[in-house]
Regions:
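A glycine-centered beta->alpha junction motif in the catalytic cores
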Residues: 92, 232-239, 307, 512-520
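Acidic/His- and Gly-rich active-site-bordering loop/insert found
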Residues: 2-137, 158, 162-165
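Acidic/histidine-rich catalytic neighborhood of metal-dependent amide-processing enzymes
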Residues: 133-223
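Short glycine/serine- and small hydrophobic-enriched flexible loop segments
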Residues: 150-158, 256-263, 539-543
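Midchain, well-structured core segments that form catalytic/ion-binding scaffolds
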Residues: 190-392, 396
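Short, conserved micro-motifs enriched in small and acidic residues
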Residues: 31, 134-147, 244-251, 528-532
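Short glycine/proline-enriched loop/turn "hinge" motifs that connect secondary-structure elements
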Residues: 160-162, 221-227, 291-297, 405-408, ...
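An extended, acidic, His-containing surface patch that forms the Zn2+-binding/catalytic region
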Residues: 36-37, 55, 339-553
Length: 553
């Protein structure tokens, strides 16, 4: 591959590598992820420096991974231990959204030709005709990002002897799902830290996009949003449809809770200048397995909930309050409806009550233990049965098993957290290099603005999901314990290396590729900025971070 790159400009190298990577399918949770990492490994090994120093590029197997996925690392050792980590994920979402054009999803030229005559979206057509945009699955998210890191790896390897600090590169799978690549990478990062590397910062280049149609600002993020997955198991009281008003219908309860939480802007954190999204329902299901005329017994749902400064405890407290309020409103409504129906038909008063408890997973365990019930024995059995299966379904199975253990079969709404959990992080001025990173970023952006006429804005939090969330942890031990106590069998189902994340402690800066329509069939990356401006910005900022004295170029 090096022979195809060596006589080309930086921009040409970046585009050529992007096209090469887009052409290889690497859908999350498929063997294609491993094939792409192997291709990247092969590309790196073709670079002259790594021909002479093969020990500085290596593959890391992801222990216990069902798809046998791997990470690839490359290191350029500098004159001092100060180190910058460049990281990029190589997986993509699948291509079902392309419909009949699925065969073209990995062919940028064919897609550009198609969109050049496309009448369904005038902007897409205009941009295809301009030649400034490269189309294809992963072109934006984020094969172009991996390509730019490869381009910079090549160029930095060509000036390796003059590097003040160490440059470390990671290309990993599984960002779009469970972050297995980055979580495995923590072990390597800790190993190298123990061997003497001193991490200053990490640079991710996950994609950025316009906030609105007139927006051409390029956003730089000095931290990353976190995420929790608050989950609800609703256990009701079944009834024949001929006696429906005496039921406690879990679908009704779930629907009302969903209405109060889903896309509710009142639940959004107020952070000046930051792009903060509301909670979103990702899963909603009642638990009937076949048709009959009995109302459902239980229902389940979970929400994507971004956190910026909030902790898991804050989210739990908020949602408990919303749920209790909703359940009380439903109690009043249901009892009123029952009385109206009874009076309308001339039935005598009854002692029927609509009562639903609201509790956390921790509360439920404590209640059952206080009754002398074998909580741990049941959890051990269910965790063993669900080992290696979907972690969210496993979590629901554990909660359901505890509910079934209750001899009273009390109707309940049980609130808990399911995997994954992404810590939020941000550039902390108290961190050893915090002030230095911010000052050097400002200066570098001033230089690039003068050279390119680009407009930049710095934000505290990358507002979407990113691997960089796992590189540091700001929650206190008490705050983490709320998560641990309310994520069913976290140590078995989702053994998150909390202590390792806290130990590695690398601030992650996102300086992303730029384009439109990530995860859509019209996905495309903007070449003039991404291939011409961004590589130099990232490379020079990294050199700034490890420089022994202030750089003037």
């Amino acid at each position: 591959m090096y022979n195809d790159l060596k006589n080309r400009s930086t921009a040409e190298r970046a585009e050529m590598l992007t096209r090469r990577l887009v052409g290889i399918k690497s859908y999350t949770r498929t063997l294609g992820e491993t094939e792409k990492v192997k291709e990247i490994y092969s590309i790196i090994k073709s670079f002259p420096y790594f021909q002479k120093h093969p020990e500085d590029v290596w593959i890391q197997s992801i222990a216990g991974d069902p798809y046998n996925r791997i990470n690839v690392w490359a290191k350029l050792k500098g004159r001092q231990k100060k180190t910058v980590l460049f990281h990029s994920h190589i997986d993509t979402v699948e291509t079902d959204d392309f419909g009949t054009l699925q065969s073209l999803a990995h062919d940028p030229d064919a897609l550009q030709q198609y969109f050049s005559t496309y009448e369904g979206d005038e902007r897409v057509k205009e941009q295809a005709l301009s030649g400034d945009w490269l189309f294809g699955r992963g072109s934006l998210d984020m094969q172009s990002g991996a390509a730019i890191h490869l381009t910079n790896l090549l160029e930095l390897s060509e000036q390796k002897d003059s590097l003040d600090g160490t440059m470390l590169f990671l290309f990993n799978p599984d960002e779009e799902s469970e972050h297995a690549g980055m979580l495995a990478a923590l072990q390597e990062l800790q190993r190298m830290k123990d061997e003497g590397l001193k991490y200053v910062a990490a640079i991710n280049n996950d994609f950025i996009a316009p906030m609105h149609d007139q927006d051409d600002t390029k956003y730089i993020y000095t931290g990353a949003a976190g995420k929790v997955l608050p989950s609800f198991y609703i256990y009701g009281r079944e009834a024949h449809v001929g006696d429906v008003l005496t039921s406690i219908d879990p679908t009704l309860v779930a629907s009302e809770i969903n209405r109060k939480i889903n896309q509710n802007l009142d639940l959004v954190e107020e952070l000046e200048g930051e792009y903060v999204l509301p909670p979103a329902c990702l899963y909603f299901k009642e638990d009937k397995h076949s048709y009959n005329v009995q109302t459902a017994v239980s229902a389940r749902m979970y929400f994507n909930y971004f956190v910026f400064e909030l902790t898991a405890k804050d989210v739990m407290d908020k949602l408990l309050s919303v749920t209790r309020e909703t359940v009380e409103e439903l109690r009043i409504q249901s009892e009123r409806r029952y009385d109206e129906f009874r009076i309308h038909h001339g039935f005598p008063p009854s002692n029927w009550k609509w009562e639903v408890a609201v509790c956390t997973y921790e509360d439920l365990q404590n209640e059952l233990r206080n009754k002398g019930l074998p909580v741990d024995k049941v959890l051990d059995r269910v965790a063993k049965e669900w080992k290696g299966k979907d972690r969210r379904e496993a979590s629901f199975a554990l909660v359901e098993a505890l509910q079934q253990l209750d001899p009273d079969k009390k109707p309940r709404v049980i609130l808990f957290f399911a995997p994954p959990f992404l810590p939020h992080n941000y550039l902390n001025e108290q961190y050893e290099y915090g002030t230095e990173i911010r000052e050097k970023l400002v200066k570098r952006l001033e230089v690039v603005t003068a050279e390119s006429n680009e407009t930049f804005a710095t934000k505290r939090f990358f507002p979407y999901l990113a691997d960089g969330s796992y590189l540091s942890l700001h929650e206190t031990e008490e705050e983490v314990n709320v998560l641990k106590k309310n994520m069913p069998r976290m140590s078995d189902i989702y053994p998150l290396p909390i202590d390792l994340i806290r130990s590695v402690n690398i601030p992650s800066i996102n300086i992303g590729v730029y384009g439109r329509d990530g995860h859509k069939w019209t996905e495309r990356v903007y070449k003039p900025y991404t291939f011409h401006v961004l590589p130099g910005l990232i490379k020079n900022f990294a050199l700034d971070l490890v420089a022994k004295k202030e750089r003037t170029q």
